[in-house]
């Protein structure tokens, strides 16, 4: 997550202190974004002082601000989108239904992005949860960036909401 809670949560998951998780779609995806694009993040400790012009500059440079942390769209979101789209299309063509976290589990456990990790994978709570196959409840998936990607791909006919 943008608050780097994954470091302590991953340790608790691996120590069998966590048996299920409920989180927002943003919490789910941000752990993976951080995993592959950490070095490209921008920290803005004085985020309350940003002017509308400052905000526009961040947007123009493809940074999505979450409080004091700016997530790089191209290095994080679009990279993960490509991997998820393949999984969504494959699931739709096979008539398979999955929960949002199951697509991330598949991505993480496949090793497809392992060479792109920019943080210690031991700090990823989602990877720890995938390794334990923990159930995750994700209300509000549609409000997340990847949830919006999924909706747009459905609207444009590239996949369907099986």
Question: Residue locations for each model-derived region?
Answer:
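Conserved catalytic alpha/beta core of Sir2/sirtuin-type deacylases, generalized to analogous enzyme cores
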Residues: 2-162
């Amino acid at each position: 997550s943008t608050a780097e809670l994954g470091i302590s949560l991953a340790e608790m998951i691996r120590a069998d202190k966590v048996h299920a998780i409920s989180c927002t779609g943003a919490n789910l995806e941000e752990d993976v974004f951080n995993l592959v694009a950490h070095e490209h993040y921008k920290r803005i400790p004085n985020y309350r002082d940003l002017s509308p012009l400052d905000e526009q500059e961040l947007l123009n440079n493809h940074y999505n601000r979450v409080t004091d942390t700016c997530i790089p769209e191209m290095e994080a979101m679009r990279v993960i989108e490509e991997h998820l789209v393949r999984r969504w299309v494959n699931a739709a063509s096979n008539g398979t239904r999955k929960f949002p976290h199951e697509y991330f589990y598949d991505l993480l456990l496949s090793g497809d992005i392992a060479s792109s990790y920019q943080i210690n994978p031991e700090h990823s709570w989602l990877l720890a949860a995938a390794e334990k196959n923990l159930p995750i409840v994700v209300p509000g998936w549609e409000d997340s960036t990847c949830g919006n990607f999924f909706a747009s791909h459905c609207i444009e006919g590239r996949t369907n909401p099986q």
